[in-house]
């Protein structure tokens, strides 16, 4: 610590010291000590941002790497994370927002929900931190209302096709198909392998893995345009072009026993990995669920035109106590945070175009290249949502075990579809 001192010529300084020494000896031993000048440094206030998202387990571990990177860059900001299901938030948030309150500063939620809350005036506009030109085309559509961006895109899961173990294919001299006929022939060949219960394991929970398989067939043989028209209700499920996809492509595979009956999806991962099944349709997050992701290969349906790219969206409620810092975090998550996230075992894809293939975790690089060469499409049942989504799941579970009831399934999907 420095003391305040005037600049005194050397000779005068020496003289002053001599006089001071003599004086101190003559004055009854009394010593006067100056108090040094202390400069007080203002400590920067540390604030806490609360973040709500859907992740837990290994997925949360990957996301926490992103949050830790933000905290490292912003030592004055600490982050608290809580896990909530979107289904629960859809009930909790509207009530809190109406009371001008929020449980967190940054919240991950469905795109359609964010748009709805934005229209009601509960969210901050993000146009100043999000440049649409920097993102995958169309990725902001679901969170933009009248030109106002209410949701920021994070990374996305893709639902790109059927996964297989490279070691399994090498052991049985199997090759990925190039045509639809090749695909059917491959299933028949796999079915004959001793110990195989079915060529394809059918993951299930509430029904969504089956919906992902179905949408992959629609996108391959009907394209993105048909998927969008089904979402909007502009094309019926009993329409000939939709029925044809079921009758000529999906249902024959079900009847031939190429798909297993629905099995709880995480258990299905283990059974497939052990070799009881050869193929498994699942999202890219499966790369973080297996022992050796480098043993994974991917087979999209031959001729696929588009794939479901399902981004995670985040919003900043108007009722945050720290709007500046919350927007700073939102911008980070939508940009450089994506670069960090795709480098983890998250199994996610970037929606920010400034992320390169080299930024990806190695087992995801080939997947990223495949997805880059097709159109991105929204998830059908998530886009429609509501009670119809549950009907869709239930009807597909019925179709999987009783494919002869296709007419009944398609009719029910039309009857239960939300009316405009």
UniProtKB/Swiss-Prot annotation:
Residues 1-25 form the signal peptide. The keyword Lipid biosynthesis does not apply. GO terms for cellular component: plasma membrane. The modification N-acetylcysteine is found at residue 26. A lipid is attached at residue 26 (S-archaeol cysteine). It is found in: Cell membrane. Its main location: membrane. The keyword Acetylation applies. Transmembrane segments: none annotated. It is a lipid-anchor. Keywords: Acetylation, Cell membrane, Lipoprotein, Membrane, Signal, Transport. Coiled coil: none annotated. This is Uncharacterized ABC transporter extracellular-binding protein PH1039. It comes from Pyrococcus horikoshii (strain ATCC 700860 / DSM 12428 / JCM 9974 / NBRC 100139 / OT-3). The lineage of its organism: Archaea, Methanobacteriati, Methanobacteriota, Thermococci, Thermococcales.
